[in-house]
Amino acid sequence: MGIEQKYDVAIVGGGLAGLGLAIQCARMGYRTVLFEKESYPFHKVCGEYVSLESWNFLQDLGLPLSDMQLPIINRLLITTPNGNYLETPLPLGGFGISRYTLDQQLAAIARQEGVTILEETKVTNVIYRNNSFLVFSGKGETEARVVAGAYGKRGNLDVKWKRQFTQVKPNKLNHYVAVKYHIRTHHAADLIALHNFENGYCGISQIEENKYCLCYLTTAANLRNSRNDISIMEKDILMKNPFLERIFSNAEWLYEEPLAISRISFNKKSQVENHVLMIGDTAGLITPLCGNGMSMALHSSKLAFEEIHSFLQGTSNRFEMEIQYTQQWEKYFGRRLQAGRWLQRFFGNTRSSNLLIKTVKPFPKFVSFLIQQTHGKPF
């Protein structure tokens, strides 16, 4: 196969960060191509809670959020494995929407704006030479002036490029599995709950059509010790928490099988690799208990776009674009990720989660402060 049309921007991965960047680039008249290995619409392992800091940005992208009758979530419940709990208002709050709906709608907007979306297309390599890129995929070779990596938590390119987080031996920050269901259950629409269990925690909140997203994170060891059987693990470990026992016993399950992903790493990642700008989870993964991953993905697409735009306009060179993007990313997200890693130490353990709740319960302002450390302001 020969080289395809030359693009200004090529984006590897069509999640929130990739689609957000694609729409912004196409609107400025840049020829934009996006590679997505799946086909829209599709389900993804994700907590499906979006911080309200993203509301205006999503509306600006063309998503009619105000007309979608989505649940607005402004309360948080945290429970310990033995049933102690803390309920608190969320300082900014969020809303619930499934990735199935959100990604599909953003992909439709991207197409309307003129983005070339190549679905069911896996990128096998990206090579930089002579101030340009060659993107190798099942569709042949594509040339682009700028490439962004938006392929999620862990991809084949990470391994190919030997990114540092893939070279680290299994440890407390890099050996997790996540499992997601959609369910129907009795649960307040304005409440997101985080239920702790031994070596993990489970989030539940409402999405569109009165459905609920139930998504949990746990260690690979927990699954291994349950004969690698998710249902055994849920019965023997998760359901020891009385809140989870009630949900698992009474919910209507809307999936035949759960969605699951493994080898999740919270280790630090680089924001630029081989001159490719990394956005969303590809640049750094915040612990899910923060409820900020989707907003960070969208915000990082905005930061990346600003630097790409300067570069394509000729007001900055490639080196300046890469340095500026890395600095902006660190400025907005560095502390947030650190706070998330620190907070996660108190989760997934009976003693430490009880200690956290007992310590902070009398100080609602401090609870509010802790939550704010893991979130940003509207962008």
Per-range role (PLM):
Residues 306-379:
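C-terminal helical "tail/cap" subdomain of flavin- and related membrane-associated enzymes
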Residues 39-59:
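Conserved N-terminal glycine-rich FAD pyrophosphate-binding loop of Rossmann-like flavoproteins
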Residues 26-46:
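Glycine-rich FAD pyrophosphate-binding loop
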Residues 54-105:
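A conserved beta-strand/loop capping segment in the N-terminal third of enzymes
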Residues 109-244:
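Predominantly flavin-linked oxidoreductase catalytic cores and closely associated redox partners
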Residues 7-33:
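N-terminal Rossmann-like FAD-binding beta1-loop-alpha1 element of flavoenzymes
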Residues 17, 40, 154:
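Conserved Rossmann-like nucleotide-cofactor binding loop
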Residues 125, 141, 224, 228-307:
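FAD/FMN-dependent oxidoreductases across multiple families
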